[in-house]
């Protein structure tokens, strides 16, 4: 599901909100999650999951064109850990073949 599809689905399920209002709300939520992670924070949505940063250690990679080794710097990457309720619901749906 894309962001546009998510906005469309929410607008359909919440007819009292316009698509523009839903779009603005989704945009604000994503911006706030991004801002919190950018400042080193963690975002937890109970029952859904949590967003945090994980550090990837510096390593030696390879240039795919030449095969030459390339030193890659360490960096922080966003990480999502699903919550228990989300995991259980997904697993139950998959068991039913959805």
Swiss-Prot record:
Keyword flag Transcription: yes
Region feature Disordered, mapped onto this chain: 56-78
UniProt keywords, alphabetically: DNA recombination, DNA-binding, Transcription, Transcription regulation, Translation regulation
The organism's place on the tree of life at top rank: Bacteria
CDD domains reported for this sequence: IHF_B
Annotated disulfide bonds: none
Job description of the protein: This protein is one of the two subunits of integration host factor, a specific DNA-binding protein that functions in genetic recombination as well as in transcriptional and translational control.
HAMAP family documented for this protein: IHF_beta
Subunit structure: Heterodimer of an alpha and a beta chain.
Protein known as: Integration host factor subunit beta
Species, as recorded: Chromohalobacter salexigens (strain ATCC BAA-138 / DSM 3043 / CIP 106854 / NCIMB 13768 / 1H11)
Encoding gene per record: ihfB
């Amino acid at each position: 599901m894309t962001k546009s599809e998510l906005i469309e689905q929410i607008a359909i399920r919440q007819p009292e909100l316009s698509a523009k209002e839903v779009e603005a709300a989704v945009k604000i939520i994503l911006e706030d999650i991004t801002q919190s992670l950018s400042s080193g924070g963690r975002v937890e949505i109970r029952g859904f999951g949590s967003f945090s940063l994980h550090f990837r250690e510096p390593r030696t990679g390879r240039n795919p064109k030449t095969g030459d080794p390339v030193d890659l710097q360490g960096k922080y990457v966003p990480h999502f850990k699903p919550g228990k309720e989300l995991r259980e619901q997904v697993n139950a749906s998959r068991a039913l073949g959805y």
